[in-house]
Each structure stands twice: as C-alpha cells, then as structure tokens.
Amino acid sequence: NNSHWLHFTLPYVALTSKGFFDTGLKYLSTPQGYVFLFCSYLCHMENTPHKAGFVNIIGNPNVGKSTLMNAFVGERLSIITSKAQTTRHRILGIVNGDDFQMLLSDTPGIIKPAYQLQESMMDFVKSAFDDADVLLYIVELGEKELKDEAFFSKITNSKIPVLLLINKIDKGDETSLKESMTLWQEKVPNAEIFAISALENFGVSEVFKRIIDLLPQSPAFYPKDQLTDKPERFFVNETIREKILMHYKKEIPYSVEIETEEFFEDEDIIRIRAVIMVERDSQKGIIIGHKGEAIKRIGVESRKDLEKFFGKQIHLETYVKVNKNWRNSDRQLRRFGYNG
C-alpha cells in the first residue's frame, strides 16, 4: 500500500527541523514508526560527519591539568597530588561519542629541567605542540606567567586553536576573575578564554562542547571501546608512585620510579609484583620505614585503589631496589619509557 510510504516520508522530512528522537517517538505506536526510527537512525549516522583529533593539555605544575583530563574522560587516568611534577609521562585519554573521538593528552607541568629525567619530561611537552589539533593552555586564577618563555612563545604564535582555561575560579571572587581574564586576553590574544573549576566540574561542559566544534573531520584513531593507550602495568606504577608522593617528603618522591615486574590476571584476582626503584641506600631505608611499616602502608593504599580501578581483587607485592643515578642515565630512562 503506497500510503505506508507516505506515512514514513512525512516524519522523515520533519526530521531536520524537529530532531531525530522527538520525531520518531510520535510514530512509535505504529508499525511504520518502528521502521522510521530505525531507518532515520541509519540515515542520521551516515549523514553526520565523524570528527577526531588530538587535544593536548599544557601549563605550569599544579594548575589542574590532570584533574581536567580525568573530568573529561570520566576515569582516573592521571594521578593527582599537591606536589609539583606529579605527572611525568604524556598520558592519552580517549573520549568517544557516536560521531567523535577526542584524544586528550595530559602532559607534565612546565619547569626548567635540573636533570635528565626532567629534560625528558619537557620533551613530552614539546611533542604536544607537534600533533595537536586543539591546544588547552591551563592557568590557575591569580597566575600571571608561564614559567618558560620559549613555551609561552609557542602558545602565542600557535596556528592551531588555543583554548585558555582559567582554572580554580572557586578559590577567588568576581573581581580577581575579571582581572585575570583581562590579563590573559592581552597576553594571549589568539586564545579563546574560559573560566572553569575542574575540581567542581564548573564550566567544563562548555569547554568540552567547544573542543568538539573545533575537531577536524576524521575517522576514529582508536577502537571506540578503548580508554587509553597505556597498558595496565603503567597504571599500577602510577598508583604506587602517587602514594609515595603523598607520604614522603623532600627528594624521596622525585628519586623514585616504579616497575611492575609481574602482572598475572585470573578470573577473580590480579597478582602483581612491583619494585620501587630509588637512587641511594639511605632512600631505601626511608621507603621501607621502621619494621616495614611505611612500605606496608604504601602497599595497602595502592591495593585498595587498584581494586577500584580494575574491579577485581588485587594481590600486590612490593619491594625496594637501589638503581643508582637512574634519573641521569639514558639507558635507564629509556627502560622506564622516558626516552626514545
């Protein structure tokens, strides 16, 4: 019966003005409505161009880069502490939608390097300028300059879109925010400026929407069910290192590297053996603590977080090993994924 096709065509024409979902609902009570809903969905998917691109996050230490990354991804991929240099690697978080894939890259805070490890960390930041489709430059309210003039010059001369995010606005007032926005509009005239609180999730959705607008048309780079490019062992290492950053002072947290030697996953349990690398024998004693109490605390807290992350019971063994001067060794830095 030709009237069946007329029934289908009329709501289909209305699709562009009334929206796929609302229009389809009106016809769900009819057999034609089910056909319409399915066919309209296919048409919608075919006619919506897919977007994908790299969105790289840069800024000074402790301005909220990792907090924003985790807010976007919806998972705790980057560890967060109050100490500078918490992020050492460039960490990719993947946000997927039906018609987009956003590849977010969290980078170490910008510093002047004092040893080879820090030089490698700054190489990660430099690489963020090379492949970005959108650059997120994060400052915190009250901040007035980037700590490295060369990086700042790259931002102000960038040919790609720059979104400058003034973070932690929950810690200030309207006057300080206006002053900060005026300052950064003058310093980075090529940037779009947003006021946000990544921790409180304020203003984040507006930034998210703007990023999607700016993404280039492209097929997805990764499978749509993939969350990151890092392996499970990386997140084990970072979780343990986070606890060390939280509980130890002075040079200890910055002299430590974690290496997961064993990672065996069964149906109900994951068995992990990890080594905590330090540079000196004296640091080894501090990490272990009196009667092993300090390293026991690190193990217990790490295990709890890893059980939340993996959704399974975790059996975690940790021990400490001296790896002298690893932060200035090209070979050791490559081993830990910082070079080459």
Residue spans of the language-model regions?
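Short, positively charged and aromatic/hydrophobic N-terminal segments
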Residues: 23, 30, 40-44
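Nucleotide-state-sensitive switch-loop elements of NTP-binding domains
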Residues: 83-146, 172
